[in-house]
Amino acid sequence: RYAYVSAHFEGFTDHILAILDMSETAKPRLAGRWWLPGMWRGGGETPTWRTGKRYALHHALVTGNLAYAAWRDGGLTVIDVTEATKPRIIVHRNSDPPFGGGTHSPLPLPDRNLLVLADEPTSAKCSEGLRYIWMYDVREPGNPVSIATFPQPAEADYCAKGGSFGPHNLHENRPGSFQSSRLIFATYYNAGVRVFDIENPFQPRE
């Protein structure tokens, strides 16, 4: 019934979460919205993040009544969408600082109480540092715990190769596609496509 969309509304600094009621597919209706504090400039909010950082929803994936949302330099949120008209924040986690931000792709694995989260590079030749794929234990949605990072491709010097190096998109186990809670497919800009085995979530291996 509902679609969970990244949208830029007037008065906001960037993209936020919009929940659309698709009961009438020809007439989608806005049911609810959620944003990080500081994004609604038109409502008198003031951005709290550092100059040069971008707080913007890339996208959210929903499993059950929980939306796992990636906010670029704003990190990760887990949002309760039980009431579409009143989405409610459960937790906000941000690894920037000390890590570089760019949170891009969430992948919840509900059958294992895990979340894979990829941070995207935004510069060439690793000039802003490396970006990572993170593994979170989310058995307690209000307390996601980072338990591992995925190994970085190391068979070549990809930072020196030119262009961007680091994680980008994850295969999202969409209906009708290949689905796995053990094999993780990740694009890596100039390092191609990588497949990781997470049978042991504490030690992902390529």
Please give the residue ranges for each predicted region.
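Feature marking well-ordered beta-strand scaffolds used for ligand recognition
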Residues: 1-206
